[in-house]
Amino acid sequence: MLTNLGSLHAIAACRGDGLRPELARLLRGGANAFPTPGETKMSREQENKALVGRWFEGFWGNPWNPQIIDELAAPDMLLQYSLHAPRRGRRDVRSFMLDFRAAFPDLKFWGAADLIAEGDYVVGRWEGGGIHTGPAFSDFLVGSLPPASGRKMHFTGTTVLRVENRMIAEEVGLDDGVTALTQLGILKAA
């Protein structure tokens, strides 16, 4: 059972080291993989956690996998975090991440605790960040960065994802945006 996002890098390589066969197959074969005869079918919560684990690793990890958007994001997916305006749909989500990663080429987030699942919802705690070495970035709700500011951000958050028809329908996160914006020099500490 997938329990810790911190080990996703090894899992994503799909070596199957110590993984239950159905989880290794799910990670290799995507959300439509099914157990072979004799294997126990994963619960909906287990499937949803595995799907969210693949999403976190592919979308927020480094290197990122742009194809993960077409593979796992619902066509009208909602992506919403306190630092940025809400994004809706695959094209908008892709555009957001392309701009974010151009500005922060080393951007990476990883799991800080076990995933929790209930029904269609999966909750994950994470941490991460990056150094702004790319073009000017103005996607924050307040302020912007000039080109290659060299400023570093490292912060944490908690995200609630809703899975619908084996796709990520919503990703809504609460992050420590004040810390990130202060580190980037956009907000001034009191």
Q: Where on the chain are the PLM-derived regions?
A:
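Residues at the start of alpha-helices and the adjacent loop-to-helix junctions
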Residues: 2-4, 44
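Generic early N-terminus positional signal peaking at residue ~5-7
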Residues: 6-7, 47
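C-terminal and inter-domain tail/linker signature
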Residues: 14, 23-26, 32-190
